[in-house]
Amino acid sequence: MDNAAIASQSNTPPSNGRSSARFVTPISVHSSPITAEVIEPSSPFSPPSPSTLLTSLSKSPSHKISNLQMDGAKTTCLEVLQNSSLVVDSPKRQDKSITGSKAKPASTMRHGQRTASHKMATQTEIQTVDGDRLIVSPKTRKKKAATAKRTRKQDGVAERRLHGHVSKVKSPGDLKLDAKIPPSKPCDNKAPSVGDNTDNELERQTGGLQLEKATKRRLDWTPTKEGPIPMVDLAEVHSSSCGKSVIRTHSAGTLLSNYGFSGVVNTSLAPMPETCDNGPTTKRLMELQNFYSASGIQTPTESRPATNDSQSISSKQQRVKVKKPQKAKLTTLTSYVTAKYSVVDQTADLDRIETVNSGKNKKMGVTKRTSGTERANAARGKSDTLKNGNGPPVFKVVPPLEAFKSFDGQELLFGTSSQLEHGHSEDQDEEIQHTADSINKSNVVPRPAVSKGLGSSLFRLSSSKNLWSASSRDLTGAVLQVDEIDLSERSIEVSTPAAKYKRKTGIRDLSGQNVIDVEKDTRTLAANIDTRELDNMNEPSLAEDDLVYRENLESTNAKLNSQTPANISEAMLERPLPDKPIFGGFTTSELAKQVAAYGFKPIKSRDKMISLLEKCWENQSKSSKLEPKPNQRNHKSQGDDLAERQLLGLKPRSDSISFVNTRSPKKRLAKTSVKSQESKSFSLSNEGPRITSKLPMKRFVSPCAILIDDDQSSDSVGEALPLSPSHSSNGNGTLHHPQDCDEIHAPTTQMAIRSAKSSISVSSTTNLPSLSSQITKAVQSQPRIRAFKGLKQPTWYEKILMYDPIQLEDLAAWLNTGGFGLIGEDREVGAGVVREWCESKGICCVWKKQASAKSH
C-alpha cells in the first residue's frame, strides 16, 4: 500500500458529505506494532523513531496514546482510493463508538465479519481533523481487545458519572458510588473521554488490592461533623480550580485527628458552620431554660421569639411561672423538716395557709357567680383583705354542693400521725385552727357536748415541739397539750377492780340489814364508797372524780376518829379470828417470815418452826375470848360496820354475811354438828330481821358461827391487806393487831372450807369461778417440797408433767386440806370432780385399791 495514495485520499471529501467530521478508520497493516508512519508535505516517506513516540505518550495530558501529527492537508493517497469501500464504512463505525448507537447496517456487518480476526492482527488508526492533518497511531491486539471492552463498559459508567456528578448535596447512595470510583474534577463541562477513565480503571485493576486506600475509606465511617456537602476526598484531592470550591474537604489525617466527642452534637444539615461549631446542645438549652425560669423545657422556637410581641408575651409567661415554686405545696415530711433550715424566703413557712386561703377565695368567687348575693360580695372583699394579710381569715357557709367539692381541694400530707408536727408560730396555729373550724362548719358536723365536760384547757393548741404532742388531737383536729391531760383516772377505776373482784369471788355489798338487801344490790361499789360516791361517779370530769375519791377517804377516817376507844376495842374483840392455818403447807421461806413476825430468831428445823407457830397462834387466839352482848351490836349501822372492816383491812363478801365474835380451838365442833348448824343457818337466812332475835350470838341475820373469819382469811393471800398503815394507826387498835395482819396471809383452815360450802347464797353461785379452773390454779400454785432423807418429793404439778398416775382420793384430799387454801378457794371437791378434771386435761388418774372411809 502506498503512503502517497493515503495522503491524497485524505484530502478527497467523502461521499457522504462529512468533510469536516472527525472519524477514525482502522486499517490492517502487515507491519510491526510499533511502526508508525507520519506523513508530512516536506518529507512524506520519513517515519518517526520509537523514542519520539514514547516521549509524546508520556507528555500527553489526557493519558492517550500519542498520535503523530503531520502537516499538509493536501497530501494525496492513491492506495486509499483503491480501498474506498473500507474508507466509506469507517465513519459509521466511528459514529457507533461515539454515540453508542446500536444500529448496524449491512456494510457494518460485513466490516465486522471482515475484521473478526483483527484480535490477532495489528491495527492502525487514522484520524482526520478538519482536513488539515492526519494522525496515525499503531494499535496492538491487546489494546484492541481492551478498547472493545472499555467502549461497552465506559458507556454505562459515563452515563452514571454524568447523572450523579452535580453541584448539590449528595445522597448516601452517591457517596458509596464515589467511594468505589474516585471522582475526577474537570474544569470544563464536557463529558469525560472514554480513554481516560478506562485507562485509570485498568491501572486500578492491575494495581492489586490497594490496602492503604481501603483503610482510608474505612475512616469515612466515623460520625464526624457534617457540612453542607458531606463529601470526603480520601485521595487528598482538594477543590477544583473551576470556581466551585468544596466547603468540607478532609484528608485522612484530619479525620483521624478530629475523631472523638467534643461535647457538641450537630443535628442540622443547613450550610451554617457557625451553628454547627458554636451552637449549644439540646441539654444545654434545657439547663439554661430551667435556670432562668421554672417552666418546662421549651423548644428552640419558643426560646427565640421572632417579634417584640412574642417577646413580651413570653416574658409575662416566665414571670408567672417563676412565682410557682414559691407557692409549691409541702406534701412530704422531708419538705417540712428541711424548710426550717433552708435559706429560702420567709413565705415558705406560710405555704399551707396561703394555699388554704387561695382555695377559699376561689370558692367564694364561685359562690358569688352562682348566687350573686351581697354576702358573696362581702366574702370576696374579706378574702381580698386576707390576701394582704390585714386580718384573720373569715369563712362563710357555702352551699352543700360546694362544701362537698371542697374535699377535692384538701391537701394530703404523707407521714405517720406521730410525725405530723407543724413548725408554725402561734399566730399561724390560730389561723389553722380557724380554718379547721370553718371546714367543720361547712360540713355541718356538730361538735359533741362531751368535749365541754373534758375541760376547755385541754383543747388549747399545743406549743410543744415533741412528737407525742403532735400525735394527740381533739375532735376538731387541733393538737392537744399532752401535759395538761390527767391520765390517772383514779376515780373511774375505783369501781373497776371491785367489780372484777365481785365476779371472781362473789363479793356483795352490805347495803341493808338482811341478806335479801345484799342480794338485790349487786351493782354497788366497794365497801369504801357510800351512796354519795355513787352520785359523783356519774360525773365525767376527771378532777371531780379525784376529789370524790379523796372525800370518801376523809369521811371514812372521820367516822373512825369519831368512835370512842371502847367501841374500837369492842370492835376488835368482836372481829372473828381465823381458824388455825396449816403451817405444814407453807414453804420454808414463808415459815421463816412467820417466825420473824413473832419476834423469834431464825430456826433451821422446819418442824420446830411449825410447832412454834402453832403455839403462837393458840396463845394469840386465847387473848380474844370475850363475847359482847348481842343487843349492843344490833343497833349499829352499816356504815360503822364498813368502817370497822376497813380499819382491819378486810373486804366484805356476799357469802360471809355474819361475823363471829370470838373463836378458839376449843370451840371447834365435830364436822357433822357444824354442817347441821350451818344448814339451819342457811335455811333461816331468808327470813329477814326475824333471825336476830332467834340467834342472839350473831350480828345481823346469818346464824353461821364460823363464816366470816374463814372467808376473809381465805381471801388473805395478798388481797385482804389493810389499805395503808395510817388507817390502822388512826383506829388506835389493840397491840395484837399487827399480829392479826400477819396471820391474814396464812392459808385457810378446814373449818373455813367446810363453812364456805354451805354459806354460799343462790345469787353468788353464778359468779363463782368453775372448780376445774380452781383446781388447775391450786395445782400450779403448790410450792416445791424439800427433799426428805435424800428423796425428792415432787409436787402434784411435777407428777402430772412426769406422767405419773394421779390417785384421785389423794389429790382431792390435798385440795380440800391445803390446795384450795393457796388460792383462796372455800369450796370442797370430791374424787369424782377431780376425776372429771383429770380426764378433761388428759391426766393419767387411778383410784385407790382400798377406798377410804373418811368423807372429805
From Swiss-Prot:
InterPro entries to which the protein is assigned, alphabetical: Slx4_ascomycetes, Structure-sp_endonuc_su_Slx4
UniProt key word DNA repair: yes
GO biological process annotation, one example: DNA replication
Gene Ontology CC terms: Slx1-Slx4 complex
Gene Ontology molecular function terms on file: 5'-flap endonuclease activity
Region (Disordered): 1-24, 39-61, 88-121, 139-201, 296-326, 362-392, 621-640, 653-688, 715-742
Keyword Lyase recorded: no
Subunit structure: Forms a heterodimer with SLX1.
Family designation: Belongs to the SLX4 family.
Protein role: Regulatory subunit of the SLX1-SLX4 structure-specific endonuclease that resolves DNA secondary structures generated during DNA repair and recombination. Has endonuclease activity towards branched DNA substrates, introducing single-strand cuts in duplex DNA close to junctions with ss-DNA.
Name of the protein described by the UniProt record: Structure-specific endonuclease subunit SLX4
Organism: Ajellomyces dermatitidis (strain ER-3 / ATCC MYA-2586) (Blastomyces dermatitidis)
